[in-house]
Amino acid sequence: MSRTPLDTVEHAAATPDVELPWAELGLKKDEYERVVEILGRRPTGAELAMYSVMWSEHCSYKSSKVHLRQFGEKAPQSDALLVGIGENAGVVDVGQGYAVTFKVESHNHPSYVEPYQGAATGVGGIVRDIIAMGARPVAVVDPLRFGAADHPDTKRVLPGVVAGIGGYGNCLGLPNIGGEVVFDACYQGNPLVNAGAIGVMRHEDIHLAKASGAGNKVILYGARTGGDGIGGASILASETFDDAKPSKRPAVQVGDPFQEKLLIECTLEAFAEKLVVGIQDLGAAGLSCATSELASNGSGGMRVTLDDVPLRDSTLSPEEILMSESQERMCAVVEPEKVDRFLAICEKWDVIATVIGEVTDGDRLEIYWHGGKIVDVDPRTVAHDGPVYERPYARPEWQDALQADDANKLPRPSSSEELRDQVLKLVASPNQASKSWITSQYDHFVQGNTVLAQPEDSGMIRIDAESGLGVAIATDGNGRYAKLDPYAGAQLALSEAYRNVATTGAKPLAVSDCLNFGSPEDPAVMWQFAEAIRGLADACQQLGTPVTGGNVSLYNQTGEVAIHPTPVVAVLGVIDDVARRTPVAFQEEGQLLYLLGDTREEFGGSAWSQVVHDHLGGLPPQVDLERERLLGEILISASRDGMIDAAHDLSDGGLIQAVVESALLGGKGARLVVPDGLDAFTFLFSESAGRAVVAVPRSEELRFNDMCGARGLPVTRIGVVDGDSVEVQGEFTLPLAELRKAHEETIPALLA
C-alpha cells in the first residue's frame, strides 16, 4: 500500500483524486465516503488502514450495536458491578476487598485457517484483556464447537485447537478449569473457538484504558511488531468464509506464551509501583486500536512516531505497522518522571519497551513516519463513531415448519431393552461422552488454587487462602435450542450456566457472553441475533446478573450456510468458603437421591432426539426464571449448610446423563425409581430446565425436605446411591463398567 512520495496528510489534501483500495480493506463505498466527509479530504493510506480495521464488524460492532444497547438499558441493579460494558473486561466485587475481572472472546475464523496458532492467540488475547484491567490472571476456560465428530476436517481442526489452547495456557501457568466441547455438522468449516479468562485484584488496583495528562509518555512494550495478523480484524473476523478466496493464513497471528508470561509479570510489577496512568493491550487492530482508544477515552490527544516502533520485519510499511496484530504487546501511558523506572522494570523482565509518543493537550491523534505526518484524525471518529447499521431482520419462513416438526411425536422405546440400549447410545454419543481425552491435555491444577475443574458443573478457584474465598465460572450454550427459538435459546444458555454455578454452592453474580452467529446481511440471521439479545437481556434482568461485557462474532458461515445461532454465556459466582463446595460425584453409598424441579415432556432440540433420530424440531424446553432463581438459592443454602454432598444440573441428556456422570465420577452406582405420574422414558430423557439432582445424607433428609417445602420448590425422592450399576427399577440395570466403556471410549476412537 505504500506509495512514493510518502502519503502524508499534506499530500492527501493536495491529491484528492488518488484512488485508494478501500474495498480490499473491507470498507463499503458509503463508509469510505463517510471517512472523506469526516476528514474533509481523502484519507492517507495510513488513515485508511486505521479506519478500515476499526470500522470492521469485529471492532466496531456496527451491525450489533443497536441490539447490544439492551444490556445497558435492561441492566439489573447490582452492588457487585464495579466496571461494566465498554472496558477491556468487566469487573465485579467478590468481597473482602477483592475484585474479579472476567470475559469471553472468540477466535473462530483464525482457528479454522490455522488451528494451533488461532486457538493459542485466542487465549493470549483474552489473558491480555485481563491484565489490562490491573488483575493477575488466575484461570482460563474454553467453550468449543466443531463439525460432526466423524468428519475428516474435525480431525484436522480439533487436535490443533486443543493443542494450541493447552500449549499456551500451560506455558502461562494458568489452569484450564472449564468449558465445553460440542459437535454438530452446522459448525463444519466454521468451528467456534471461544476463550475466557478470570483475573483477581484488589479494588484499588483497577486500571482503565485511557490516556490523560498532557506530556505523559506513550510506551509500547512486549514483542516486536511483525507482519502476522495484518488485517485480522477486517479480513478474518468480519467476512463470510468462502473456499474460493485466496489463502488467509498470513492474517493469523503467531503466539509466544513465554513472551506473554514475561509481559504479565512486567505489567503487574509496574502496576504495583503505581507507574501506569492508562493501559491498553494490542489485540484486534493492533496499534490502530490501542492509540485511538487510549486517546479517545482520555482527556487529551496523542502524538505517535511510528519510526520508534520496534520491528521484527524492517520492510513493513506504516500501514502494515498500524494494522499488525502481532501478539504479546501492550501500550502504557506513563508520567515522564516515571518512565525510567518503567523501562527498568521492562529490562529486568527482558521485555522490549520503547517510548513511541506522548499525550497532547489537543484533541487529535497525530502519527508520524520518516518525519511526515501520515495520520491526523479525531480519535473518537476512529474508535467510537463508526457506522451503525439497523440491518433488516425478519423471522425466517422456515421457522414455523421447524417448530411444527414436534420432537415429542418421535417414536419412543417400546421395551425396557430398547430403553436400555438408547441410554447406552446416548452416553456414548460424541456430545455426551467423556471429553477427558481433550481436557487431559490441559493443566487444571497449576498454581495450586483450583478447587473444581472439568468435568464439574463449574470451575472453581480459591482466591484467598486464609478465608477460603473463591469464585466459580460456568460457560454454556445450546445452538440447537437457539435454532428452534433464539429468544428461549439464549435464556436457556444463561439458565444453565447460572444453575451450574449454583450447584457447586457459589452465588451467581454477573455475566459475560460470546455471541456467535452467521452473516448480518441475512435478515433471518439478524432476526436470530435480535431475538437472542432480547432474550438474554430480559433473563439477566430477572436473574439479577448484569452483563459486564463480551464479544460478538458474526459471519460464521461457509457460503450461504450459517451455523446455528450460538449465544455462549459465562456466569461468574462467588463462594465464601471453597471448603463448602459441592461436587458432581456421588460421595457415599446410602445417600438419598432427590430431583429438584418439575419434569415435563420436553424433547425439542434434545440430545435424545439428536442421537436416536438425528432430528431437530419442535420447541425447546420452557424457561421459568423465577424457578431458576429459587432453585439456585436452595442449592446454595443446602451446600453452605451441609445438607447435600453432591449436586448435578440437568440439561443435555436429561436425568439419566446426569446420574451416569455422577456415578462414574464417584465410582458409585445408583438405584432409581420412576416417580408417580411419569413414564420411564420422560423421567430419564426429558430436558426440562430448572432442575438438578442432589445426593442427601439420610441425617439431613428431613431438614432438606423442610427447606424445599418452605420455599415452594418441588422435590421428589428418586433413589439412592448404591452398588456398582445404574438401575432403573422395573426397567434395566447397567453396570458401571459397561457405562464407563461406552462413555470413555468414543472420543479417543474418533480422534486419537
From Swiss-Prot:
Monomer. Part of the FGAM synthase complex composed of 1 PurL, 1 PurQ and 2 PurS subunits. It comes from Streptomyces avermitilis (strain ATCC 31267 / DSM 46492 / JCM 5070 / NBRC 14893 / NCIMB 12804 / NRRL 8165 / MA-4680). Pathway: Purine metabolism; IMP biosynthesis via de novo pathway; 5-amino-1-(5-phospho-D-ribosyl)imidazole from N(2)-formyl-N(1)-(5-phospho-D-ribosyl)glycinamide: step 1/2. One of its GO terms (biological process) is 'de novo' IMP biosynthetic process. GO terms for molecular function: ATP binding; magnesium ion binding; phosphoribosylformylglycinamidine synthase activity. It catalyses: N(2)-formyl-N(1)-(5-phospho-beta-D-ribosyl)glycinamide + L-glutamine + ATP + H2O = 2-formamido-N(1)-(5-O-phospho-beta-D-ribosyl)acetamidine + L-glutamate + ADP + phosphate + H(+). Part of the phosphoribosylformylglycinamidine synthase complex involved in the purines biosynthetic pathway. Catalyzes the ATP-dependent conversion of formylglycinamide ribonucleotide (FGAR) and glutamine to yield formylglycinamidine ribonucleotide (FGAM) and glutamate. The FGAM synthase complex is composed of three subunits. PurQ produces an ammonia molecule by converting glutamine to glutamate. PurL transfers the ammonia molecule to FGAR to form FGAM in an ATP-dependent manner. Substrate binds at residues 106-109, 128, 253, 325-327, 553. Mg(2+) 2 binds at residues 129, 281. It is an enzyme of class 6 (ligase). Mg(2+) 1 binds at residues 105, 551. Keywords: ATP-binding, Cytoplasm, Ligase, Magnesium, Metal-binding, Nucleotide-binding, Purine biosynthesis. The active site is at 58, 107 (proton acceptor). Its main location: cytoplasm. This is Phosphoribosylformylglycinamidine synthase subunit PurL.
